[in-house]
A protein has these predicted regions:
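Residue-level recognition of short loop/turn positions
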Residues: 18-19, 190
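C-terminal, beta-rich DNA-binding module of retroviral/retroelements integrases
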Residues: 142-195
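Short helix-capping and hinge/turn segments at secondary-structure transitions, especially at repeat
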Residues: 117-124, 128, 139-154
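RNase H-like DDE/DDD metal-dependent nuclease/strand-transfer catalytic core used by mobile genetic elements
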Residues: 2-11, 19-133
Length: 195
């Protein structure tokens, strides 16, 4: 949680596990799907499609039922529905890897510690007073940070695939609801009917 000019915000981000390079950072009013979609968009546009994404077990990434189906349920063909984030990753061909303990997320946790000590000072020096200014500043900050701290990967083979020009990210990084149209051409979303 961050305070910018008296308001609280949440920082979302991603780091390359092989290099320590900060791939994306984004502030939002709270931890939310839209902010994680923005982080993913930054990665896709600037680096391409990652082969995999390592995430914690937040319900934005994984259904609360993830890993809880019995063998009988699995044999009966039942499955846990993807979250919207999980669905977007599948559409992009990205493997989602859930972290099983905080220790397995060492790099990102160390990054948060570094950012919590450095960014407030940087914001003050730059006169940052709004979330918009903070997000714009983060783009420049990442460049400087990565030049200073990122390292060469042990394996030179890229873990990113090129993002095809034909891919419209607005059609993937969005909410999608699948519904059936009834006989009177009506769909229901929760308690609402649409004609």
């Amino acid at each position: 949680e961050w305070i910018i000019d008296g308001e609280r915000f949440t920082l979302h981000g991603a780091i390359d596990d092989a290099t320590g390079e900060v791939l994306a950072l984004f502030f939002a009013k709270n931890e939310c799907l839209d902010a994680y979609f923005e982080v993913l968009r930054q990665i896709l546009v600037n680096y391409g499609i990652p082969l995999s994404v390592y995430v914690d077990k937040h319900t934005i990434f994984l259904s609360p039922k993830f890993g809880k189906l019995s063998v009988e349920d699995e044999l009966a063909g039942k499955r846990v529905n993807d979250t919207q984030f999980g669905r977007a990753l599948k559409e992009l061909g990205i493997t989602l890897i859930p972290a099983n303990s905080p220790q397995t997320k060492g790099r990102i946790e160390r990054l948060w510690g570094t950012l919590q000590s450095r960014l407030p000072v940087e914001f003050k020096l730059a006169g940052i007073k709004s979330i918009e200014a903070a997000n714009a500043f983060l783009q420049k900050f990442m460049e400087v940070y990565n030049q200073k701290f990122a390292v060469s990967p042990a394996n030179r083979e890229s873990a990113f695939r090129e993002l095809p020009k034909a891919v419209n990210l607005d059609h993937i990084l969005c909410l999608k609801e699948f519904r059936k149209v009834d006989n009177s051409s009506v769909i229901r979303i929760r308690y609402f009917l649409f004609h």
